[in-house]
């Protein structure tokens, strides 16, 4: 299984599937559809049933049940890689029997246990790293490789009891659109798991409540030589507004269950300037308080202005899946037991972000998140451990077996 996983993963990361938040297309990049077509052909050749690729880039397939009366479950991963860092010409490095020392990434970069202490747990194992010029794509091509490998194992080992199993590979998860065209009804699963986490043992069913706020400052432009008493610089208004934001309530000062405001982007000219913030909190009431506080700050600042004005638009992005998953405790219990059966210690922690599963849970498909075995996603220091990928694959198989016992 290890060699098969490795070969499958290396094949997948050769596809540059970065999504593009500026695009209105679905998928946002054609390369995701090309990758999905490749996977469709592979699934058909491996004997999966009902292999379908929608015009929106959603790839689904089925492993038929070999026992009756068992819940249909699903496994989900995403096709795209993050637009945050280059995904072109990915050149993986395979480090066998890792010795615990610095790993050279090309000529200029280093992956060091001094900076990334997680490396210390993988001494003696096989790592896949970047060459320093791109991200790796383990998020989420490791998840895709693990799902296909696990479900193919079930197809070729009919002695393992399991119910009907569905898979779906979604586009544009990294830009928050992965669930936009997901057809929960036709998917037909009672619950599902995204395979989109990090280190071995991660089991996540809490995520941020998330919103985006766009604060717009309006000014008045004129020739700077005749600007006295006339010009209103929207950029100055925006900068002074941001100076009123709490300095410590930001991502770089938060961890665990802390929420934050994050200035994601700012742009403007004299006439108009915009500040784009993301708002995050695990607690729903605190989340609502944050949105109210920011709105009130805009109102107070407007009252101080003699000229110029701010407006604010806040849109919710996704909510904490915890409220939708906890009423179905068997979903978590089965995943925990599957790991324990494989001598894996479950690591239950909140997702300081979101997954397709967070939105799908509110669409009627409870969907916690499981580990892939990767680290340092979205950048040049990304790496995955092949032995961890094997464990993720085995966990998927074990979940299928345990679900067959849960009637």
Curated annotation (Swiss-Prot):
Enzyme class, spelled out: hydrolase
Q: Which organism is it from?
A: Shewanella halifaxensis (strain HAW-EB4)
Query: Which Gene Ontology terms cover its molecular function?
Result: metallopeptidase activity; tripeptide aminopeptidase activity; zinc ion binding
What the protein does comes down to: Cleaves the N-terminal amino acid of tripeptides.
Any one GO CC term of the record: cytosol
Q: Which residues form the active site?
A: 80, 173 (proton acceptor)
Residues that bind Zn(2+) 1:
78, 139, 196
Q: Which GO biological process categories is it annotated with?
A: peptide catabolic process; proteolysis
What protein name applies here? Peptidase T
Binding-site residues for Zn(2+) 2, renumbered to this chain? 139, 174, 378
What's the family?
Belongs to the peptidase M20B family.
| Annotated cofactor note | Binds 2 Zn(2+) ions per subunit.
Q: What is its main location?
A: cytoplasm
The catalysed reaction is: Release of the N-terminal residue from a tripeptide
Cellular compartment(s): Cytoplasm
């Amino acid at each position: 299984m290890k060699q098969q996983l490795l070969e499958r993963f290396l094949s997948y990361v050769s596809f540059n599937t970065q999504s593009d938040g500026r695009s209105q297309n679905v998928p946002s990049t054609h390369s995701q559809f090309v990758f999905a077509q490749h996977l469709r052909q592979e699934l058909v050749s491996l004997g999966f049933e009902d292999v379908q690729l929608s015009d929106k880039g959603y790839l689904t397939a089925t492993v038929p049940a070999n026992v009756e009366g068992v819940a249909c479950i699903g496994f989900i991963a995403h096709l795209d890689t993050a637009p945050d860092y280059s995904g072109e010409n990915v050149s993986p490095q395979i480090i066998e029997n890792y010795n615990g020392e610095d790993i050279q990434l090309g000529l200029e970069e280093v992956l060091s246990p001094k900076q990334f202490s997680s490396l210390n747990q993988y001494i003696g194992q096989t790592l896949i790293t970047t060459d320093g010029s791109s991200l790796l794509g383990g998020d989420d091509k490791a998840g895709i490789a693990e799902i296909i490998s696990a479900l193919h194992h079930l197809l070729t080992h009919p002695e393992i009891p399991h119910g009907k199993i569905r898979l779906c590979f979604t586009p544009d998860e990294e830009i928050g659109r992965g669930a936009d065209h997901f057809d929960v009804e036709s998917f037909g699963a009672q619950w599902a798991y995204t395979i989109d986490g990090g280190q071995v043992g991660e089991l996540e069913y809490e995520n941020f409540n998330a919103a985006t706020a766009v604060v717009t400052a309006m000014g008045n432009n004129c020739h700077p030589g005749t600007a006295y008493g006339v010009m209103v610089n929207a950029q100055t208004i925006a900068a002074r507004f941001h100076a009123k934001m709490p300095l410590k309530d930001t991502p770089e000062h938060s961890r665990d269950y802390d929420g934050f405001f994050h200035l994601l982007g700012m742009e403007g000219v004299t006439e108009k300037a915009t500040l784009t913030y993301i708002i995050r909190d695990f607690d729903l009431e605190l989340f609502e308080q944050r949105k109210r506080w920011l709105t009130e700050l805009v109102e107070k600042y407007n009252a101080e202005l003699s000229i110029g004005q701010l407006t604010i638009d806040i849109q919710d992005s996704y909510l904490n899946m915890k409220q939708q998953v906890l009423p179905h405790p068997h979903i978590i219990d089965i995943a925990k037991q599957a790991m324990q059966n494989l001598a894996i210690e479950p690591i239950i922690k909140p997702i300081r972000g979101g997954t397709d599963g967070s939105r799908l849970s509110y669409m009627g498909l409870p969907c916690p998140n499981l580990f892939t075995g990767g680290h340092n996603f979205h950048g040049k220091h990304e790496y995955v451990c092949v032995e961890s990928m094997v464990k993720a694959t085995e966990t998927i198989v074990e979940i299928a077996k345990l679900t067959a016992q849960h009637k």
